């Protein structure tokens, strides 16, 4: 079998990861800290600049204190308690062992190529190893023992890797019946609307239905793959078909998820630019406020209502500016998660593409790419878990 059986589905079929705070959350939640540079360049000429800077620094210190309250052991415990966390850790260990196995195989080849006599005396020395033989041929004995150790270690690594792969399949097992029920619900809705074209388009012709179909398609073949590993069925020709369809379904899901994350990134960048422009306008207005206030004292009686309202707005507290900083901080955090998702999906896409197209790649390419995917996924899960724990302590 190729490496089809070692893949894992992303997005829909994974256990949903912790979700990070989006920038919309910052509009309603005043507990999120704003960025560390907030207030550093603000309003040196305004009357509220010093108090705002002190408030910003105080919020940052509180945020750092809350973050330090969550130690790494607690975060690791929460990750291990989640299905997604166990899957990520198992994936990292499996492909790290696969890479280690490649180094062991290379070491064995180098050992036998440099000294072919090692293979000649391999069995003889292991059967008749005595102190006398070890003293007469110390170098050869050391090489034989090293080769024996590497061979045994190689077999153990291969066994552990296979068990971890099966463990990850078991973690994903059992979701197909629920996906089938979801599709039956859609069929019932279609039947109740008397198969009207507009309603059919609304129910079926959308991205959510496409993703549900891909999840169901992948889940069926993924669970059939596990049943084959457990020897529930043993048809090898059908298993080749199952492995192929499993990888194709995963590839479709990867591409769809990449598209969604790319559009999400563009939306976040657009919103970030809008907030930065808005913040710059407010900063410029506050820099002009001392001049306007000075002029207002001179001709207080001749002010128009609009000018009075403008001066009043400039003299109020900096809640709007603080809120913008919170939203910018939330967007920055959200973009970090999106970048990690894009990196993870890119690793998965390259690994799965090399497998589907049977590309001639250097040995270990699939394992290295899959390890990169697992590490980026774990980093994202670590960040979101830490944020979740910090927010729960507020």
Curated annotation (Swiss-Prot):
Bias (Polar residues) occurs at 1-25
UniProt key word Iron-sulfur: no
Cellular compartment(s): Peroxisome membrane
Sorted keywords for this record are: Membrane, Peroxisome, Peroxisome biogenesis, Phosphoprotein, Transmembrane, Transmembrane helix
Residue ranges of region Disordered? 1-65
* Membrane topology, from the record: Single-pass membrane protein
Q: Where do the TM regions start and end? A: 367-383
Per the record, what is one GO cellular component?
peroxisomal membrane
Residue spans making up a coiled coil are none
Q: Which Pfam families match?
A: PEX11
Asked whether the keyword Amino-acid biosynthesis is assigned, the reply is no
> Which segments show compositional bias classed as Basic and acidic residues?
51-65
**Which ranges of this chain reside in the Cytoplasmic compartment per its record?**
1-366
Tell me which InterPro entries the record gives.
Answer: PEX11 (IPR008733)
Which residues in this protein are found as Phosphoserine? 58, 63, 289
Any one Gene Ontology BP term: protein import into peroxisome matrix
Lumenal topological domain: 384-394
Q: Which PANTHER family match?
A: PEROXIN 11 (PTHR12652:SF50), PEROXISOMAL BIOGENESIS FACTOR 11 (PTHR12652)
Q: What does this gene product do?
A: Required for regulation of peroxisome size and maintenance. Has a role in the import of peroxisomal matrix proteins. Imports RHO1 into the peroxisome. Also promotes peroxisome division and biogenesis.
What does the record note on quaternary structure?
A: Homooligomer. Interacts with PEX27 and PEX34.
Q: What else is known?
A: Present with 2420 molecules/cell in log phase SD medium.
> This protein is called what?
Peroxisomal membrane protein PEX25
Q: Which organism is it from?
A: Saccharomyces cerevisiae (strain ATCC 204508 / S288c) (Baker's yeast)
The record lists the lineage as:
Eukaryota, Fungi, Dikarya, Ascomycota, Saccharomycotina
Query: Which gene name does the record give?
Result: PEX25
């Amino acid at each position: 079998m190729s490496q089809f059986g070692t893949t894992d589905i992303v997005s829909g079929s994974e256990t949903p990861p912790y979700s990070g705070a989006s920038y919309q959350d910052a509009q309603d939640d005043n507990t999120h800290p704003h960025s560390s540079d907030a207030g550093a360049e603000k309003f040196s000429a305004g009357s509220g600049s010093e108090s705002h800077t002190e408030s910003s620094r105080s919020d940052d210190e509180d945020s750092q204190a809350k973050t330090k309250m969550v130690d790494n052991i607690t975060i690791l415990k929460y990750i291990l308690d989640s299905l997604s966390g166990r899957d990520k850790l198992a994936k990292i260990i499996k492909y790290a062992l696969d890479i280690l196995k490649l180094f062991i195989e290379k070491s064995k080849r180098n050992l036998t190529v440099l000294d072919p006599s090692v293979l000649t005396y391999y069995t003889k020395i292991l059967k008749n190893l005595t102190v006398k033989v070890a003293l007469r041929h110390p170098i050869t004995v050391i090489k034989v023992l090293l080769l024996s150790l590497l061979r045994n270690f190689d077999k153990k690594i291969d066994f552990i890797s296979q068990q971890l792969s099966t463990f990850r399949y078991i973690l994903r097992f059992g979701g197909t019946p629920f996906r089938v029920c979801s599709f039956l619900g859609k069929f019932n809705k279609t039947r109740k609307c008397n198969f009207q074209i507009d309603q059919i388009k609304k129910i079926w012709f959308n991205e959510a239905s496409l993703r549900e179909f891909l999840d169901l398609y992948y889940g069926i073949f993924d669970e059939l793959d596990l049943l084959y590993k457990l020897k529930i069925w043993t048809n090898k020709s059908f298993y080749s078909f199952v492995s192929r369809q499993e990888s194709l379904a995963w590839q479709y899901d990867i591409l769809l998820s990449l598209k969604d994350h790319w559009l999400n990134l563009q939306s976040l960048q657009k919103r970030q630019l809008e907030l930065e422009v808005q913040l710059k306008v407010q900063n410029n207005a506050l820099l002009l406020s001392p001049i306007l206030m000075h002029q207002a004292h001179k001709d207080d009686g001749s002010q128009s209502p609009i000018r009075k309202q403008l001066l009043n707005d400039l003299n109020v507290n900096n809640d709007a500016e603080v809120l913008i900083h919170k939203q910018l901080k939330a967007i920055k955090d959200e973009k970090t998660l999106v970048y990690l998702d894009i990196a993870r999906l890119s690793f998965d896409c390259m690994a799965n593409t090399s497998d589907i197209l049977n590309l001639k790649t250097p040995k270990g390419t699939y394992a290295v790419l899959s390890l990169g995917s697992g590490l980026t996924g774990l980093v994202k899960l670590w960040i979101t878990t830490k944020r979740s724990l910090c927010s729960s302590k507020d």
